Curated annotation (Swiss-Prot):
Beta toxin that binds site-4 of sodium channels (Nav), reduces peak current (observed on Nav1.6/SCN8A (IC(50)=172 nM), Nav1.1/SCN1A, Nav1.4/SCN4A (weak) and Nav1.5/SCN5A (weak)), shifts the voltage of activation toward more negative potentials (observed on Nav1.6 and Nav1.2 (weak)), and induces resurgent currents at negative voltages following brief and strong depolarizations (observed on Nav1.6, Nav1.1 (weak), Nav1.2 (weak), and Nav1.4 (weak)). The keyword Phosphoprotein does not apply. SMART domains: Knot1 (SM00505). InterPro entries: LCN-type_CS_alpha_beta_dom, Scorpion_toxin-like, Scorpion_toxin-like_sf, Scorpion_toxinL, Scorpion_toxinL/defensin. Has the structural arrangement of an alpha-helix connected to antiparallel beta-sheets by disulfide bonds (CS-alpha/beta). It comes from Centruroides limpidus. Disulfide bonds join 12-65, 16-41, 25-46, 29-48. This is Beta-toxin Cll2. Its main location: secreted.
Amino acid sequence: KEGYLVNHSTGCKYECFKLGDNDYCLRECKQQYGKGAGGYCYAFGCWCNHLYEQAVVWPLPKKTCN
């Protein structure tokens, strides 16, 4: 599974500005989804890959980013 890293309290994607390989996104994806996860910056949001199937990614149901 893959998808955008989401802040569960706000419903917003984690923003990033250095597209492609991005240490911040990689670190945040691993912290939220485990050491097997990967991550990079895609379209100014942290995109995580190699996730377990039940991983929660953006968008959250009934939670819009404010």
